[in-house]
UniProtKB/Swiss-Prot annotation:
Highest taxon listed in the record's lineage: Bacteria
Protein name in the entry: Type I restriction enzyme EcoprrI specificity subunit
Function per UniProt: The specificity (S) subunit of a type I restriction enzyme; this subunit dictates DNA sequence specificity. The M and S subunits together form a methyltransferase (MTase) that methylates two adenine residues of the sequence 5'-CCAN(7)ATGC-3'. In the presence of the R subunit the complex can also act as an endonuclease, binding to the same target sequence but cutting the DNA some distance from this site. Whether the DNA is cut or modified depends on the methylation state of the target sequence. When the target site is unmodified, the DNA is cut.
Family affiliation: Belongs to the type-I restriction system S methylase family.
Additional free-text comment from the UniProt record: Type I restriction and modification enzymes are complex, multifunctional systems which require ATP, S-adenosyl methionine and Mg(2+) as cofactors and, in addition to their endonucleolytic and methylase activities, are potent DNA-dependent ATPases.
Amino acid sequence: MSELSYLEKLMDGVEVEWLPLSKVFNLRNGYTPSKTKKEFWANGDIPWFRMDDIRENGRILGSSLQKISSCAVKGGKLFPENSILISTSATIGEHALITVPHLANQRFTCLALKESYADCFDIKFLFYYCFSLAEWCRKNTTMSSFASVDMDGFKKFLIPRPCPDNPEKSLAIQSEIVRILDKFSALTAELTAELTAELSMRKKQYNYYRDQLLSFKEDEVEGKRKTLGEIMKMRAGQHISAHNIIERKEESYIYPCFGGNGIRGYVKEKSHDGEHLLIGRQGALCGNVQRMKGQFYATEHAVVVSVMPGINIDWAFHMLTAMNLNQYASKSAQPGLAVGKLQELKLFVPSIERQIYIAAILDKFDTLTNSITEVSRVKSSCARNSTNIIEICYLVSRSRK
């Protein structure tokens, strides 16, 4: 019998109770202790979680990258162990199960299971169901200086409790769902690691052949040494308020909006049309280069590049990437690239025919190297399975009525 068939048998005819999130959890907002008070951060032993913890260490966490001192805790009260953190502003929907007493920054809302429901739920079952909550959050945001979740609706989000009149069977069902999803998670992690290693090898191959193709003995190849300003036009994009950007494409928000590190969301109006390159202008990742075709909006944190006649835009993309423009960033708290400085950089420009030849070869490697969507699909599969399997609770119960 398959695992899903077994789960359906376990669920046969059971009732599902749907409870508002605020009835199941105590909600508390995170905060950042004052950075000016050194005693709040010196010799800290209390885990203080940020988005970086999830990005670097996953969704089930028992320690944090940064720690704070006990004197930094408001009212001396920590978030309890085995509670769930979910981001309700900025990068919305990211969540993690925290297995130790802790605190978090203001981007997170802590979901701590109420004592009255402590014996009714498996916290890991609720953690997996938060993938569905996360999707709801991303679709229900309010816009001000930055995106934030509609908290009134958030508190009303419904949580399923299978077989509410039989606590023992309810926990057995939840435990079985968790077991299946744990297996999905393990397989996902294994496959993701394999794919990431494969992509790393492809990247090394691409870099090697790119460097070989873009390195010339100038006396052996037709061409001239020029500055970037001689072969391309560079101009910073235009400022746009954060409240005019939404996360997903919909209705009149049809134009992708690019900042210094890639796409930020979608906007109503375009700033550019055609075939261009975008160079990240500000931030730790400034100097990254992307190709863009069609209609889009570029913010002031991106440099929009248009090539001159006699320059192949795909060759220019690979050349700029190989130049590692990040090395020319200002050494400050907020690294940045000056357009004027970029325009003065020199390089050897071969004939247009050789540019096209080089670009065609490197594009093939680039396609192989950047199969990141494959990894992204694998990483998101567990989230989809979490929602799909848990929703069997609802579907099976309805089919038996």
